[in-house]
Amino acid sequence: NIVGEMIDIRDNVVKSNSVNYQSLIGEFVHLNNSNTLIINGGRVTTEPKHNLVIRLDLDKKELCLSRPAFRKFLTEENNVTPKQWLFQMTQSGAKIVEKRKKMAANWKPGLDQFNVDAYILDTSTINKTILEVIDSELT
């Protein structure tokens, strides 16, 4: 009988901490605003002030997130697994690729030779308010 009650609670109680997976991108971008490189028209419009964690390429409609930094953000700060986040995002129609990326390309000579593991998101498939966190003029 106790097991039945537990199952009933699990199935019928509204979860108070349901996760908005798209908003996690916005939160990560907001936390790392000073770690963002923005490229527009092949030119740097915003340079990171600290470690390069995010690259936004407006012409290519790509938002690149450093995979190690984003995974740490998901697991340690939000208790969400990267696999769970990726699944939910693709279910919502977001196009995301996991691959190695030259995050510093077109920025500083020498640094652009190094690839890092990244999540590359097609910005035309994600909520536009995420980009507003970076710069309201981008949307």
Segments and roles (model prediction):
Residues N1-T139:
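Extended alpha-helical interface modules used as scaffolds for assembling large macromolecular complexes
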